[in-house]
Amino acid sequence: MISQLRTLWIVLKHTFSRADTVQYPEQRPKLYPRYRGRIVLTRDPDGEERCVACNLCAAVCPVDCIALQKTEDVDGRWYPEFFRINFSRCILCGLCEEACPTYAIQLTPDFELCEYDRRNLVYEKEHLLIQGTGKYPGYSFYRVAGKAIAGKDKGQAENEAPPIDVHSLLP
């Protein structure tokens, strides 16, 4: 008898409670500030692509969904010849964003990645590259790291410290 009354109480309590279901197309779900969604490639403040094709993102990816090939520009700047992410394999873990030294890879709160054909989930560089700078608007990797200047060794450019000889520091 007690179990039947308890069951009736639970049914009545849940009958008049508010449902947790969100009617998705009409109501947007609440996304938290650190939500990790679709991956994008950003540009630096000069409008150039930030990615220097260092391959750290592909090396750290646990499911191996990132592929890229490095090439060099005429002024010595590295950039990816192709950059490909297979979103059918991506688990949106964010390790690629953490590993990127240039802040080129950033995760956005966009979560609508469904397609009818799985081949459409392979995004090329043209699909990933956005026009803005993303989360870090003033950062430019080449202003921080510099570029090699033809005819000058390390430490000979303007406002550049000479390289440290680590062998002289050894005991």
UniProtKB/Swiss-Prot annotation:
<dbReference type="GO" id="GO:0009060">
    <property type="term" value="P:aerobic respiration"/>
</dbReference>
<keyword id="KW-0411">Iron-sulfur</keyword>
<feature type="binding site">
    <location>
        <position position="100"/>
    </location>
    <ligand>
        <name>[4Fe-4S] cluster 1</name>
    </ligand>
</feature>
<dbReference type="GO" id="GO:0048038">
    <property type="term" value="F:quinone binding"/>
</dbReference>
<comment type="subunit">
    <text>NDH-1 is composed of 14 different subunits. Subunits NuoA, H, J, K, L, M, N constitute the membrane sector of the complex.</text>
</comment>
<dbReference type="InterPro" id="IPR017896">
    <property type="entry name" value="4Fe4S_Fe-S-bd"/>
</dbReference>
<keyword id="KW-0472">Membrane</keyword>
<feature type="binding site">
    <location>
        <position position="96"/>
    </location>
    <ligand>
        <name>[4Fe-4S] cluster 2</name>
    </ligand>
</feature>
<dbReference type="GO" id="GO:0005506">
    <property type="term" value="F:iron ion binding"/>
</dbReference>
<keyword id="KW-0874">Quinone</keyword>
<keyword id="KW-1278">Translocase</keyword>
<keyword id="KW-0408">Iron</keyword>
<feature type="binding site">
    <location>
        <position position="93"/>
    </location>
    <ligand>
        <name>[4Fe-4S] cluster 2</name>
    </ligand>
</feature>
<feature type="domain" description="4Fe-4S ferredoxin-type 1">
    <location>
        <begin position="41"/>
        <end position="71"/>
    </location>
</feature>
<dbReference type="Pfam" id="PF12838">
    <property type="entry name" value="Fer4_7"/>
</dbReference>
<comment type="similarity">
    <text>Belongs to the complex I 23 kDa subunit family.</text>
</comment>
<dbReference type="GO" id="GO:0050136">
    <property type="term" value="F:NADH:ubiquinone reductase (non-electrogenic) activity"/>
</dbReference>
<dbReference type="GO" id="GO:0051539">
    <property type="term" value="F:4 iron, 4 sulfur cluster binding"/>
</dbReference>
<keyword id="KW-0677">Repeat</keyword>
<feature type="binding site">
    <location>
        <position position="57"/>
    </location>
    <ligand>
        <name>[4Fe-4S] cluster 1</name>
    </ligand>
</feature>
<keyword id="KW-1003">Cell membrane</keyword>
<dbReference type="GO" id="GO:0005886">
    <property type="term" value="C:plasma membrane"/>
</dbReference>
<keyword id="KW-0997">Cell inner membrane</keyword>
<keyword id="KW-0520">NAD</keyword>
<feature type="binding site">
    <location>
        <position position="51"/>
    </location>
    <ligand>
        <name>[4Fe-4S] cluster 1</name>
    </ligand>
</feature>
<comment type="function">
    <text>NDH-1 shuttles electrons from NADH, via FMN and iron-sulfur (Fe-S) centers, to quinones in the respiratory chain. The immediate electron acceptor for the enzyme in this species is believed to be ubiquinone. Couples the redox reaction to proton translocation (for every two electrons transferred, four hydrogen ions are translocated across the cytoplasmic membrane), and thus conserves the redox energy in a proton gradient.</text>
</comment>
<dbReference type="InterPro" id="IPR017900">
    <property type="entry name" value="4Fe4S_Fe_S_CS"/>
</dbReference>
<feature type="binding site">
    <location>
        <position position="90"/>
    </location>
    <ligand>
        <name>[4Fe-4S] cluster 2</name>
    </ligand>
</feature>
<feature type="binding site">
    <location>
        <position position="61"/>
    </location>
    <ligand>
        <name>[4Fe-4S] cluster 2</name>
    </ligand>
</feature>
<protein>
    <recommendedName>
        <fullName>NADH-quinone oxidoreductase subunit I</fullName>
        <ecNumber>7.1.1.-</ecNumber>
    </recommendedName>
</protein>
<keyword id="KW-0479">Metal-binding</keyword>
<feature type="binding site">
    <location>
        <position position="54"/>
    </location>
    <ligand>
        <name>[4Fe-4S] cluster 1</name>
    </ligand>
</feature>
<dbReference type="InterPro" id="IPR010226">
    <property type="entry name" value="NADH_quinone_OxRdtase_chainI"/>
</dbReference>
<feature type="domain" description="4Fe-4S ferredoxin-type 2">
    <location>
        <begin position="81"/>
        <end position="110"/>
    </location>
</feature>
<keyword id="KW-0830">Ubiquinone</keyword>
<keyword id="KW-0004">4Fe-4S</keyword>
